[in-house]
Swiss-Prot record:
Signal peptide location: 1-21
Basic residues bias (residue ranges): 463-473
Chain ranges of the Fibronectin type-III domain: 116-214, 833-926
Subunit structure: Probably interacts with ABI3.
UniProt KW keywords: Disease variant, Glycoprotein, Repeat, Secreted, Signal
Main subcellular location: secreted
Protein name according to UniProt: Target of Nesh-SH3
PROSITE patterns: FN3 (PS50853)
Species in which this protein is naturally found: Homo sapiens
Tissue specificity comment: Expressed in brain, heart, lung, liver, pancreas kidney and placenta.
Length: 1068
């Protein structure tokens, strides 16, 4: 341990000079001084800047024996927190250097650079892994930071395969110019290629490379699917390195009306890199210690005279409850306002700062690729109204914690426990973009102390939806009319919301006639300036205002004329208020969109309970029912994270939805069904109408839903992708207990009839049902991981899944509430066919689909026969028939890249009815990250065979066994084809035992079913809550299992089920 730390220090100090030397243009190259200090459990490197005007940037680069593909860890910006998984022994380089001054006019060079193939170099690391490096097509001396400024431009696609024209290429995405490719076969020739991830990118010439011969494998050693022996120690504990930038100097950028003044230099300060290694002094390191890098910049908030106040991101701990990330407030330049805010981009753009006026200015980077780090484009908000009336006071968003930035903040600190979660959730609320002239004055967003002089109109738009939005920094825009009043905001770094602007919550009621009372702004509505905005609200797509805005902000709700009243969204005002909130189009994230009880129509939502200031902005935000999306009450519930759940409500909400007869509205992907509120998550009493989603409208991809924090030390790591992606707490939905195994088509050539009376999954193992309404008629990506176009059609609905979460049938089925079986005396067989047969598929999950349909009208149906057939197969072959009494059914164990046809036939005791229309669907390619495409002879053959196992399992279905090369038998018992309990045994006839995990909850046990991904498991209890049993256990992948006591005092955990992304038995 000490040696690796010493190496870290040495490398860090050496690379400082290297980092400087190579990146600066010829001429003067300033050096950086570093102060190194060591205490009992931490190493502190304090990098001193040559001058106060210099900002620093850097990254952590790892090399070592068993390096993961994500060996490039860029340090997060602006107080953000990220986690990465690293090996304990390898060496890491810390590279820090002065950042080049940003060029306001520099655009991503990817669009203009010539299309030339990259130069690829491949080197050997171990018998099963190689190191790839390729050349930039531009001069890295001047473009070193470009990858972080052009997230969609600086990614590369690597492809490789065994040298054989018949083999399929395996693809990986990489954010850096080098990566490690692992899990290769020893002594085998592979072909490698790389290309820039931009339109028209050209593949490099094929590079042939032969892996080296591996040494003999050690008996009983458990490895990845390949059986070669890695030249690494059998036991390599991994450590989690949380990387946090604690405080970063914020840059104030002020734009004067038309002329841009040079950006103000940030105050000087030091950046601290803390390497905290808790296990350093422990004699035995049982749990991997975590290294924490925190880079903090002296908190120097400067109140840019009356214009911009830079608010340092505060909060050193990952929980960062209130970081006001850096709102660099830009004084808006008056921009001509055009009424149509391009809504389309507004949504995606991550930082679009919607100048409240019509033209939301969208930052180019907006497109944020999934978890791309949105680079906080500075959203310069422009003054929205030309009308001088509004005084420009710079909205000092300061205190308002740049809500845009940290969406995270908004969540009550408590929820912020998984940092990422919170942020994703809140952001969505959209900022009401007020159409045309509507001068909305928002009360100065919250200036804490001053009630906000004059109304400032800024709506920070913070857009939205990125999975872990890097805090977009929205600069609150201030309307620039003359006379800028600079409210004196108290500079306290964190928003004190103490008197949230008293109020001016002005709602712009479009038809001024009924001013709504301010949405709950805590303080009294204040003079409701309801300026009346011209009625045409319709263009108001307004980007979503992050809810985090301190409420006062204005709940501007344009109660525009009812015309679009898209969702009941809380329209409080009787005149069909269309809460701006839900612009029709932007489909604000409105989580759940059922905005709070519509009933409180005339009254502002006050129920919201204006949170006490201490409630962290979160509440305030919530408060803003402005975004009524947040169900108001949620503020009280710490669990808000779920609440906010960015599940984007469907694009447009139509209030007219007809509630389903079943007790819960059945949310049907197909046409207009109301998303059903799942009682568990939302406190909000939903009013009778639920917004419905229109089938055809295409919704922007929704950010992954936050999930409860998982495994102690580490999140799934095997995903190739942007740096830091591993740190995103996988945002997959929380799984609920298994749904009774739904029979799947089996591989036998004959027809099999299986009844699959589905039982609703009930919350078990601590899981909670969520109100999930994320069906979309189009996939978020047009192609699957291997580049094949995804199947689209009027009868197909997509559900987005985070890339690093395993596929889950149980979670997907939660979107379909159970309906009570029809009771009634049938007088004749059903006369009408089921209608609206829809195929619901989860992106990245080719092994199953969920069929959903409407029951025949005026017929008594007691069960349905679901017929699934592989296209091109003759009658009776590859055909499956399932029986269910629900109006949906899961078809499992489908083959990748295969076309299927589905039909549904209604039945009752008197006979069968006419069959529904036939719908077709083609599954996507298999995910190469889940398991290796095995060649003939190496397949693990799962044999259905009962075995004697421990009863600690939620899965009660069929049992399968397979023999593995490491001389153990693996047994699984199914909940469904993607959720099962895994056991190990020394003999086929002996007892099969639970598998314990010394440092997690069995996430890496997916290796036993040949999955490369870390899976999801449940029920995750601490060992002292588990009975002591005998079983196998280990701490990390690749380590041989041991046999002994698990549970109880042993600190070894075991679980009731696993979801690994691999289907069992895997054949149809």
């Amino acid at each position: 341990m000490l040696s690796s730390l010493g190496c870290l220090l040495l490398c860090g100090s050496i690379t400082l000079a290297l980092g400087n030397a190579q990146k600066l243009p010829k001429g003067k190259r300033p050096n950086l001084k570093v102060h190194i200090n060591t205490t009992s459990d931490s190493i502190l490197l304090k990098f001193l800047r040559p001058s106060p005007n210099v900002k620093l940037e850097g990254l952590l680069l790892g090399y070592g024996s068993n390096v993961s593909p994500n060996q490039y860890f860029p340090l997060p910006a602006e107080g953000k927190f990220t986690e990465a998984i690293v090996d304990a022994e390898p060496k890491y380089l810390i590279v820090v250097r002065p950042a080049p001054p940003p060029s306001q006019k520099k655009s991503c060079s990817g669009k203009t650079r010539s299309r030339k193939p990259l130069q690829l170099v491949v080197g050997t690391l171990t018998p099963s892994s190689v190191f790839l490096s390729w050349g930039f097509l531009i001069n890295p001396h001047h473009d070193w930071t470009l990858p972080s400024h052009c997230p969609n431009d600086r990614f590369y696609t690597i492809r490789y395969r065994e040298k054989d024209k018949e083999k399929k290429w395996i693809f990986q995405i990489c954010p850096a110019t080098e990566t490690i490719v692992e899990n290769l076969k020893p002594n085998t020739v592979y072909e490698f290629g790389v290309k820039d991830n931009v339109e028209g990118g050209i593949w490099s010439k094929i590079f042939n490379h032969k892996t080296v011969v591996g040494s003999k494998k050690v008996n009983g050693k458990i490895q990845s699917t390949y059986d070669q022996d890695h030249t690494v120690p059998a036991y390599v504990p991994r450590k989690l390195i949380p990387i946090t930038i604690i405080k970063q100097v914020i840059q104030n950028v002020t734009h004067k009306d038309s002329a841009k003044s040079p950006e103000k230099a940030p105050l000087g300060g030091v950046i601290l890199v803390h390497l905290i290694i808790p296990g350093l002094n422990e004699t035995t390191v049982k749990l991997p210690a975590s290294l924490m890098f925190e880079i903090s910049d002296a908190l120097k908030t400067q109140l840019a005279k009356n214009e911009t106040l830079a608010l340092p991101a505060e909060s050193k701990t990952p929980e960062v409850e209130k970081i006001s990330a850096r709102p660099t407030t830009v004084t808006p330049e008056t921009v001509p306002r055009s009424t149509k805010p391009t809504t389309s981009s507004a949504l995606d753009v991550s930082e679009t700062t919607l100048a409240s006026s019509e033209k939301p200015w969208i930052v180019p980077t907006a497109k944020i690729s999934e978890d791309s780090k949105v680079l906080q484009p500075q959203t310069a908000t422009y003054d929205v109204f030309s009308s001088p009336t509004t005084s420009d006071e710079p909205e000092i968003s300061d205190s308002y914690t740049a809500t845009s930035d940290r969406i995270l903040d908004s969540i009550p600190p408590k929820t912020s426990r998984t940092l990422e979660q919170p942020r994703a959730t809140l952001a969505p609320s959209e900022t009401p973009f007020v159409p045309q002239k509507l001068e909305i004055f928002t009360s100065p967003e919250m200036q804490p102390t001053t009630p906000a002089p004059q109304q400032t109109t800024s709506i920070p738009s913070t857009p939205k939806r990125r999975p872990r939005p890097k805090p977009p920094r929205t600069k609150p825009e201030r309307t620039t009319s003359a006379g800028t009043i600079t409210p004196k905001i108290s500079k306290s770094p964190e928003p004190t919301w103490t008197t949230p602007a008293p109020g001016k919550t002005q709602f712009i009621s479009l038809k001024p006639k009924i001013p709504l009372s301010p949405e709950v702004t805590h303080t009294k509505p204040a003079p409701k300036q309801t300026p009346r905005a011209p009625p045409k609200p319709k263009t108001s797509p307004r980007p979503r205002i992050p809810q985090t805005q301190p409420v006062p902000k204005v709940p501007q709700r344009v109660t525009a004329k009812p015309k679009t009243s898209p969702s009941p969204e809380v329209s409080y005002t009787t005149p069909a208020p269309k809460d701006v909130l839900l612009p029709h189009k932007p489909y604000p994230e409105v989580s759940q969109s059922e905005p709070a009880p519509l009933e409180t129509r005339g009254i502002p939502f006050i129920p919201m309970i204006s949170p006490s200031p201490s409630q962290e902005e979160l509440q305030t935000t919530l408060e803003e029912t402005d975004q009524s999306t947040q169900e108001p009450f949620t503020t009280k519930i710490p669990r808000t994270t779920e609440l906010a759940k960015t599940t984007q409500a469907p694009h447009r909400f139509y209030t007219t939805v007809r509630p389903r007869t079943s007790d819960k509205p059945h949310i049907r992907p197909g046409v207009k069904q109301a998303p059903r509120p799942s009682g568990a998550d939302r406190n909000v009493s939903v009013d009778s109408t639920h917004p419905t989603k229109k089938p055809g409208t295409r919704r922007p991809p929704l950010p992954p839903r936050p999930t409860h924090p998982r495994r102690k030390p580490l999140p799934p790591n095997n995903v190739t992708g942007k740096p830091g992606s591993a740190g995103i707490i996988s945002s997959g939905p929380i799984t609920t207990p298994p749904l009774r195994s739904t029979p799947r088509p089996t591989g036998t050539p004959l027809e099999r009839i299986e009844t699959d009376i589905k039982q609703p999954t009930v919350p078990a193992s601590g899981e909670e049902l969520e109100n999930i309404t994320d069906f979309s008629s189009s996939p978020t990506r047009e192609t699957d991981p291997l580049g094949k176009p995804r199947f689209k059609g009027p009868h197909v609905r997509y559900i987005q899944k985070p890339d690093n979460s395993p596929c889950s049938i149980t979670d997907s089925v939660k979107r379909f509430p159970k309906e009570e079986a029809t009771e009634g005396n049938a007088t004749s067989p059903p006369q009408n066919p089921p209608t609206n047969l829809t195929v619901v598929t989860v992106e990245g999950c080719p092994s199953f689909v969920i069929l959903d349909w409407e029951k025949p009208l005026n017929d008594t149906v007691t069960e349905y026969e679901v017929i699934s057939r592989e296209n091109g197969s003759f009658s009776g072959k590859n055909k499956s028939i399932q029986m269910t009494n629900q109006t949906f059914s899961t078809v499992e164990n489908l083959k990748p890249n295969t076309s299927y046809e589905f039909q549904v036939k209604p039945k009752n005791p008197l006979g069968e009815g006419p069959v529904s229309n036939t719908v077709a669907f083609s599954t996507e390619s298999a995910d190469p990250r889940v398991s290796e495409p095995v060649s003939a002879g190496r397949d693990a053959i799962w044999t259905e065979r009962p075995f004697n196992s421990d009863s600690y399992s939620e899965c009660k279905g069929k049992q399968y066994v397979k023999r593995t090369w490491y001389k153990k038998f693996v047994g699984v018992q199914l909940c469904n084809s993607l959720r099962y309990k895994i056991y190990l045994s020394d003999s086929l006839t002996g007892k099969f035992y639970n598998i314990g995990d010394q440092r997690g909850h069995g996430e890496d046990h997916c290796q036993f079913v040949d999955s490369f991904l870390d899976g999801r498991t449940g029920q995750q209890l601490t060992s002292d809550q588990l009975p002591i049993k005998e079983g196998y256990f280990r701490a990390v992948r690749q380590e041989p299992v041991q046999f002994g006591e698990i549970g109880g005092h042993t600190q070894i955990n075991y679980v009731q089920w696993y979801e690994c992304g691999t289907t069992i038995p895997g054949k149809w």
